[in-house]
Structures are given as C-alpha cells and as structure tokens.
Amino acid sequence: MTNTITENIYASIIHQVEKKENSGNEKTKAVLNQAVADLSKAASIVHQVHWYMRGSGFLYLHPKMDELMDALNGHLDEISERLITIGGAPFSTLKEFDENSRLEETVGTWDKSITDHLKRLVQVYDYLSSLYQVGLDVTDEEDDAVSNDIFTAAQTEAQKTIWMLQAELGQAPGL
C-alpha cells in the first residue's frame, strides 16, 4: 500500500473485521461491501455530472457519462454477486450506501464548469482505484483469487478512466 487514501481504507476494513468473528474471509467480505457502497455513490455522482453538465464538450461527454455509469453498475453487480457467493450480504439500500460510502455527494448545481465536473470524477476514480488496491491486498492475504481477479479488472478500468479524464483536462496521467 503506497498512499494515504489506500492506508485509510485498509485501516477502516480491518477495524470493521476486528468487531466480528473471523471466519477466514471477513476482510474480503468487508472490502467487497465497501466497494458496493462506494460504487453506488460513484454511479450517483457520475449521473449528476451527466445531468448538470453544460458547455463545450457536452455532445461528446454526455454519452460518455452513460458509458461510465454502465461500467460502474457492471462492477457493482459483479462485486455484489461475488459477495453473496462467498457468504456475504451486500448493502442494498440508499441509507446503507450513504452510511457506508466514503464518497461525498453534493447537491447538483448549474454553476460548475465541465472542467470542475471532470476534476471531481478524477477524484472519484482515484478513490476507487485506491479501494480496489485494498481489495487486491486483502484478497491476496485471504487467498481469494476470484475476488482478486474482479478487483484487478475494476482497478484496470478505473486507472484507464483516470487517464482519459486527465487527458481531456489537458493533464498528464497522475497515477
């Protein structure tokens, strides 16, 4: 683990597991469920950008937000189903997503530029990439190759999305 965000997520997962009886894959269940909450919030944030963006680039970026939402929801479904497969219970209500996600939502406004929206999405995807790194670390520890593969695919897509968003902003990749 190399950055503070990743370390904080890992510490939070460990704290959740210490409260429970350890059955051998509790950390994996905890990080999968954290991903359920965070992916749900991330999809909501992208949806807000989709609705509230205005300006140059709208015609290209509006459908791109649909693609991002579809990808997030695909990861959400796969991660939730994996959690169920290994004996977990995914968060499934807006209240649970809100209480457990580390992503913050704000009320949509028309006064943000497309650049502001894209910078926010870079932050969201950077957080998700860090979360997926925790998932990789935890699933390595608990020897769960299937969940590890899921986190690898999700992190690969998150990092590609960061690169694409940063390129649209005229920035070099900051991974």
UniProtKB/Swiss-Prot annotation:
Fe cation 2 binds at residue 81. Fe cation 1 binds at residues 50, 77, 81. This is DNA protection during starvation protein. It is an enzyme of class 1 (oxidoreductase). Its EC number is 1.16.-.-. Pfam families: Ferritin (PF00210). It is found in: Cytoplasm. Induction: Induced by air. The gene is dps.
